[in-house]
């Protein structure tokens, strides 16, 4: 889209928004929908009250996903979504497990939790980090298995977080890596987080990138 400065200078914008929200600037269809929403005096979508519009969106998303994925939790940013996902994974076990595993080449955000599991960010991180975060080599199924076996015996693993397609590396995980991840999940009973802030909602040929892999459910 084109942007114009106050002096009238024309700037070609190749971004139009971050991650999956690359919706441009004041797109006519989005503006029309927004104006109609206000004109009809509909109750604003807000996190502190129940919203039938949010419920409808959640239902529509679950319809497009595998049948076992039926719940949505709406947040303001990718880093907040990662933080919430970490908490959900940790609390999903009656007996707490200790470790979270992440790729050494990854980016999940700059908050305390998400920054602690962002391999590409850690060397410049100037803030305290969450403990018990263990890295594995990107797209390396053997190293992944080695770390899972090791740390499962030291207190258990509650989650492995993966970018199925790394937006910073412009590189996809192999199908062999993802299949190994799911086999290990069944054996060692941990949760998987797929961070698709940059690849979700039809940025690939599927609604989410993980659906491009075989034998993933």
Regions found by a protein language model. Name each.
Residues 1-12:
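Active-site and channel-lining beta-strand-loop segments
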Residues 8, 34, 61, 85, ...:
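Buried hydrophobic positions in well-ordered alpha/beta secondary-structure cores of metabolic enzymes
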Residues 10-94:
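Glycine-rich loop-to-alpha-helix module at the N-terminal edge of alpha/beta enzyme cores
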Residues 12-15, 158-165:
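Short beta-strands and strand-loop turn motifs
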Residues 58-159:
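PLP-dependent aspartate aminotransferase-fold enzymes
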Residues 112-114, 212-217:
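Active-site PLP attachment segment
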Residues 161-175, 189-213:
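Conserved PLP phosphate-binding loop immediately N-terminal to the Schiff-base lysine helix
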Residues 184-188:
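Helix C-cap/helix->beta junction micro-motif
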């Amino acid at each position: 889209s084109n942007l114009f400065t106050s002096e009238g200078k024309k700037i070609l914008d190749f971004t139009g928004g971050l991650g999956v929200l690359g919706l441009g600037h004041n797109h006519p269809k989005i503006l029309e929908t927004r104006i109609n929403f206000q004109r009809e005096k509909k109750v604003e979508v807000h996190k502190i009250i129940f919203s039938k519009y949010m419920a409808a969106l959640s239902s529509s998303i679950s319809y497009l996903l595998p049948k076992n994925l039926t719940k949505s939790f709406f947040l303001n940013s990718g880093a907040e979504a990662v933080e919430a996902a970490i908490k959900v994974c940790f609390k999903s076990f009656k007996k707490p497990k200790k470790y979270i595993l992440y790729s050494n080449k990854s980016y999940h955000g700059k908050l305390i939790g998400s920054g602690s599991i962002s391999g590409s960010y850690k060397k410049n991180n100037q803030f305290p980090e969450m403990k018990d975060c263990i890295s594995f080599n990107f797209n390396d199924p053997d190293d992944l298995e080695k770390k899972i076996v090791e740390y499962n015996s030291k207190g258990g693993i509650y989650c492995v977080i993966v970018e199925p397609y790394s937006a910073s590396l412009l590189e996809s995980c192999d199908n062999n890596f993802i299949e190994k991840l799911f086999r290990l999940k069944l054996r060692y009973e941990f949760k998987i987080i797929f961070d698709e802030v940059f690849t979700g909602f039809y940025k690939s040929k599927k609604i989410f990138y993980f659906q491009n892999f075989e034998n993933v459910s």
